[in-house]
């Protein structure tokens, strides 16, 4: 069992399961929110640079 920081008690199975569930939810949130936002910003930057440097 994992030692909790600053505490004498060790992590129980229930606490471990909850921690793993929270980590999984955090990872899913990154995949569904952060990556698409980063891609959108990157695409907007490419479009801006292309339009600023093109010779219309």
Curated annotation (Swiss-Prot):
Q: Where is this region: Disordered?
A: 1-27
Q: Where in the cell is it found?
A: Membrane
List membrane-spanning regions.
30-50
Which Pfam families does the entry link to?
DUF4519 (PF15012)
What UniProt keywords apply to this chain's record, in alphabetical order?
Coiled coil, Membrane, Transmembrane, Transmembrane helix
Membrane topology reported for the UniProt record: Single-pass membrane protein
* InterPro entries in UniProt: DUF4519
> Principal localization?
membrane
Protein name in the entry: Single-pass membrane and coiled-coil domain-containing protein 4 homolog
Biological source species: Nematostella vectensis (Starlet sea anemone)
């Amino acid at each position: 069992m994992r030692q909790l920081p600053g505490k004498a008690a060790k992590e129980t199975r229930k606490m471990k399961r909850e921690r793993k569930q929270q980590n999984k939810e955090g990872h899913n949130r990154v995949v569904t929110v952060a990556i698409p936002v980063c891609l959108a910003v990157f695409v907007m930057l490419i479009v801006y640079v292309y339009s600023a440097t093109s010779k219309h």
